[in-house]
C-alpha cells in the first residue's frame, strides 16, 4: 500500500555502507523523537550509531540535512491508487493518510514541519525538497478524474489534497488520546470525502451514463 519516500540529497563522500547509513538514520530518529530539534546533536547521533562524527559529515553537510533524511526515509508515501473513479480513489487516499498521520512516522513528520518554522537551517533544507508526496499522488487522481469527465478541469489538484489531508491531520491531532480508539474513523472519512466531492462538483460515472442526464 505504501512505499518509501525519496530521501533528500546527500553530499558525495566515501562509498556508502548501507548498514552504517541505516544505523545512523535510526539513531537520528531516536534522538529527535526523544529530544526534539533543540536537543538533536550530531555528537549524540554518532554515539548511538557507534560511528565517528566525521563519518556523518562525510555523508550529510549538517545536522538539518541528516534529520530531514532520517525522517523522510522512514515515512511511507501515499499513492499508487487507481480504483476507477475519484470517489473510490479519494476514500482510499483518506484511509492511507489517516493511517500515516496516526503512525510514529507521521507524528515525526508533523513535528519536523513545525520545527522548521522556528529554525532557519532546518527551513532551508526542507525548502529545497520537492512537493510533498501526497500532493503529487493526489494530482494524479484528480487528472484522471478530469479526463473521465468527473470534475471540471479548473479544479486545482493541490486544493483537493489539502482539503482531505489537512482535515484529517487536524482531526487526528485535535482528538484527545483517550477518545482516539473510540472515534468513528470510517464515518468521519466518509463524511469528509463526500463533503469535498460535493464542493468540487463531482459527477459520478454512473450518473453521467444515466439516460436521464440527456434530457
Residue ranges and their predicted role:
Residues 78-110, 160-161:
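Hydrophobic alpha-helical connector segments
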Residues 1-48, 65, 77:
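Basic, helix-initiating cap at the start of DNA-binding domains
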Residues 50-60:
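Short hydrophobic/aromatic patch on the recognition helix
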Residues 21, 42, 64, 83, ...:
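Short, structured helix-loop boundary elements
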Residues 124, 132, 146-195, 200-215:
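Hydrophobic/aromatic-rich alpha-helical bundle segments in the mid-to-C-terminal region
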Residues 71-77:
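Short, basic, alpha-helical segments at the C-terminal edge of helix-turn-helix-like DNA-binding modules
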Residues 63, 70, 97, 101-105, ...:
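Hydrophobic/aromatic residues within well-ordered alpha-helical segments
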Residues 65, 70-71, 101-128:
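Amphipathic alpha-helical segments used for helix-helix packing
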Amino acid at each position: 500500500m505504501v512505499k518509501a519516500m525519496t530521501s533528500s540529497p546527500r553530499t558525495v563522500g566515501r562509498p556508502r555502507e548501507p548498514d552504517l547509513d541505516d544505523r545512523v538514520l535510526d539513531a537520528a530518529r531516536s534522538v529527535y523523537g526523544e529530544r526534539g530539534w533543540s536537543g538533536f546533536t550530531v555528537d549524540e547521533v554518532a554515539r548511538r550509531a557507534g560511528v565517528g562524527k566525521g563519518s556523518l559529515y562525510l555523508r550529510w553537510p549538517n545536522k538539518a540535512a541528516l534529520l530531514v533524511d532520517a525522517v523522510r526515509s522512514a515515512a511511507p508515501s501515499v499513492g499508487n491508487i487507481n480504483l476507477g473513479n475519484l470517489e473510490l480513489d479519494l476514500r482510499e487516499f483518506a484511509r492511507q493518510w489517516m493511517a500515516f498521520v496516526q503512525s510514529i512516522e507521521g507524528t515525526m513528520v508533523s513535528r519536523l514541519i513545525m520545527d522548521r518554522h522556528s529554525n532557519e537551517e532546518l527551513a532551508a533544507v526542507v525548502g529545497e525538497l520537492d512537493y510533498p508526496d501526497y500532493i503529487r499522488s493526489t494530482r494524479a487522481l484528480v487528472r484522471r478524474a478530469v479526463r473521465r469527465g468527473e470534475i471540471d478541469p479548473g479544479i486545482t489538484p493541490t486544493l483537493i489534497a489539502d482539503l482531505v489531508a489537512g482535515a484529517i491531520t487536524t482531526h487526528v491531532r485535535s482528538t484527545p488520546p483517550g477518545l482516539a480508539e473510540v472515534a468513528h474513523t470510517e464515518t468521519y472519512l466518509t463524511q469528509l470525502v463526500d463533503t469535498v466531492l460535493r464542493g468540487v462538483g463531482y459527477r459520478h460515472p454512473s450518473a453521467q451514463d444515466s439516460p436521464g442526464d440527456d434530457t
